[in-house]
């Protein structure tokens, strides 16, 4: 008979008392302690064995002997988990387990297939470790401000001056000044047939992605999304009732979309396709000929195009960003951009959505967009007030992405350092803040990329995002953000090289 493990005894104790993971977490809070969902899940699944103090907390909650819980009890055999009857005081878990008067509330089944690992279980574990005093280097999210990137002074000054006038709601689409500046910027980018009434500001691009998916997709409608993707696209399409279908981007071709794979996945249920250009997580910038090929696919199959272009002002190495909408005047196109990345103001939450091209064929979709836009009243007005200033005049982001600039030099360093690690291969990113290296899964014996991310976190205190978090099917990639200062990146890449020098997943 297989030897009983800690997780076996933990599950047995929970089953004997009709206690679930959420009950244990609540009971720990009543005792003034903190157990994270990811932390508890790992104990139950057997991925992690807790430290003695955490085991004592679990034993107290479940009213069992901690020695039995940690190491087993030969006298117990297959008997029920032994209670610790020495405690005279009432116990929080007993109240939880005995309560049958209140029904339980589960999350909506609409969330069953929603994935967003950029802030997921590994991040929860990192938060738990931070709560215990560990210092974690966060290479998992493109948030410039914590790494010393500052908002342009002129933008801050402008917001301060306009703040007294930003106390009320704006037009649901956005301030006139903001939409006018966005329209002019869109015209410079070559977007055809752009009108003020078809420009919408949002609390970041994220809100507008969700809004547009809800406006377009009926249950079962298919939408083509790249793999790897920014996972919010897949999550929002799923939440809206749609069916995301992932087309491959080819690592051997600088991560450009595989047009044959894209077209092979189109069915009668396909309504639209998404491109992310410049791409997150790969940093790829699509050339005009690739974009023209995508337009031809959309044209042949009468698809709407959604273009996530939030990183369009962060191109390097002479690469020029071309907006796909500028190549498709006859097709319905929705283009997303904003200031979070280019102006280092992710916390301000200001993005926009521009509808261009053939607007007659999407008139009903536009009615849906207007309805949902009205329902949320408006995006935050103080952030809208600085769009005109931010898009005009000197663009400080250019100083970051040219040779000698901080983003440019840090990108180069991380690319070269990763290229030197045995078992790691990587395509050089041409834009944005991210790099998406590939691991030799045979060399490192990797079958579970989430476990790899946890192992790296526990050993080196480095937080990355696994490739699976970007809807990449194989467990062989991960994403690194190269925003930390150079001295921090040097230390972290040394740690990463040391980790891969000996790592073999068990």
For the regions a language model picked out, list residue spans one by one.
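Recognition helix of helix-turn-helix/homeodomain-like DNA-binding domains
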Residues: 30-50
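Short, basic-rich loop-to-helix N-cap that marks the start of a DNA-contacting helix
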Residues: 45-60, 76
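Conserved core of the PLP fold type I
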Residues: 166-296, 313-327, 334, 494-495
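A short, Lys/Arg-rich alpha-helix, primarily the initiator
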Residues: 1-28
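Conserved core segment of the aminotransferase class I/II
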Residues: 329-405, 415-417, 500
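PLP-dependent enzyme catalytic core of the Aspartate aminotransferase-like
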Residues: 61, 188, 264, 445-447, ...
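Conserved glycine-rich beta-strand-loop-beta hairpin in the small C-terminal domain of fold type I
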Residues: 388, 404-415, 426-440, 474
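N-terminal small-domain helix-loop-helix segment of the aminotransferase-like
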Residues: 103-204, 211, 378, 390-394, ...
């Amino acid at each position: 008979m297989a030897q009983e493990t800690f997780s076996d005894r933990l599950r047995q104790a929970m089953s004997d008392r009709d206690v679930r993971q959420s009950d244990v977490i609540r009971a720990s809070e009543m005792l003034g302690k903190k157990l994270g969902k990811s932390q508890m899940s790992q104990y139950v699944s057997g991925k992690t064995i807790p430290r003695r103090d955490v085991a004592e907390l679990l034993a107290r909650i479940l009213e069992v002997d901690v020695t039995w819980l940690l190491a087993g009890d030969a006298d117990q055999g297959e008997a029920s988990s032994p209670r610790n009857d020495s405690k005279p005081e009432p116990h929080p878990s007993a109240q939880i387990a005995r309560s049958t008067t209140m029904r339980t509330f589960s999350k909506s089944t609409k969330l069953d297939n929603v994935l967003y690992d950029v802030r997921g279980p590994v991040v929860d574990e990192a938060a738990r470790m931070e709560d215990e005093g560990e210092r974690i280097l966060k290479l998992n999210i493109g948030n410039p401000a914590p790494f010393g990137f500052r908002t342009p002074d002129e933008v801050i000054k402008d917001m301060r001056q306009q703040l007294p006038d930003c106390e009320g709601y704006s037009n649901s689409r956005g301030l006139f000044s903001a939409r006018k500046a966005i329209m002019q910027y869109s015209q410079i980018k070559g977007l055809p047939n752009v009108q003020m009434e078809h420009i919408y500001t949002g609390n970041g691009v994220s809100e507008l992605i969700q809004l547009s998916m809800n406006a377009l997709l009926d249950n079962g409608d298919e939408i083509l999304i790249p793999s790897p993707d920014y996972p919010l696209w897949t999550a929002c399409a799923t939440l809206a009732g749609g069916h995301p279908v992932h087309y491959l981007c080819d690592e051997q071709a600088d991560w450009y979309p595989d047009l044959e794979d894209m077209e092979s996945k189109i069915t009668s249920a396909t309504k639209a396709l998404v491109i992310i250009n410049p791409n997150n997580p790969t940093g790829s910038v699509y050339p005009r000929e690739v974009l023209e090929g995508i337009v031809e696919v959309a044209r042949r199959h009468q698809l709407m195009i959604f273009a996530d272009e939030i990183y369009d002002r962060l191109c390097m190495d002479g690469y020029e960003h071309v907006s796909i909408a500028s190549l498709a005047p006859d097709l319905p196109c929705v283009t997303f951009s904003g200031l979070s990345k280019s102006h280092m103001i992710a916390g301000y939450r200001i993005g926009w959505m521009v509808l261009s091209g053939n607007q007659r064929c999407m008139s009903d979709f536009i009615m849906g967009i207007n309805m949902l836009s009205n329902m949320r009243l408006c995006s935050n007005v103080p952030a809208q007030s600085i769009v005109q200033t931010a898009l005009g005049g000197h663009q400080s982001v250019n100083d970051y992405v040219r040779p000698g600039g901080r983003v440019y030099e840090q990108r180069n360093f991380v690319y070269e350092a990763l290229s030197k690690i045995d078992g790691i291969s990587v395509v050089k990113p041409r834009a944005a803040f991210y790099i998406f290296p590939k691991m030799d899964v045979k060399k490192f014996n990797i079958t579970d990329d989430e476990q790899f991310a946890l192992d790296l976190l526990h050993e080196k205190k480095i937080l990355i995002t696994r490739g699976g978090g970007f809807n990449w099917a194989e467990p062989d990639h991960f994403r690194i953000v190269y925003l930390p200062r150079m001295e921090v990146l040097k230390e972290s890449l040394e740690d990463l090289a040391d980790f891969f020098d000996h790592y073999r997943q068990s």
